[in-house]
């Protein structure tokens, strides 16, 4: 993949990697989804994929948060709360 030059192409690159990796998760829990998103995007940052584009750490934090919520919705992950007795 070419190195992205715009914030939009950087976000698309993150989305593509996270979505592809999410398909191979053995289970879809809040923790596994959070860990996956952090691991994939942090490794892209460390590998210098975004050094040519004007994306900020704040932008990346927002992207991570949105991806986590969207994946939880896609995979119907529920936060486990204690059962309420009726």
Where are the regions a protein language model picked out?
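Terminal helices and disordered tails flanking the catalytic cores of nucleotide-processing hydrolases
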Residues: 1-86
């Amino acid at each position: 993949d070419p190195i992205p030059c715009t914030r939009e192409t950087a976000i698309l690159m993150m989305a593509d990697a996270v979505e592809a990796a999410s398909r191979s998760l053995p289970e879809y829990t809040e923790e596994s989804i959070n860990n996956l998103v952090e691991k994939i995007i942090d490794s892209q940052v460390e590998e210098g994929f975004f050094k040519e584009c004007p994306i900020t750490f704040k932008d990346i934090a927002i992207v991570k948060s949105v991806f986590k919520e969207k994946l939880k919705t896609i995979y119907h992950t529920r936060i486990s709360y204690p059962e309420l007795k009726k």
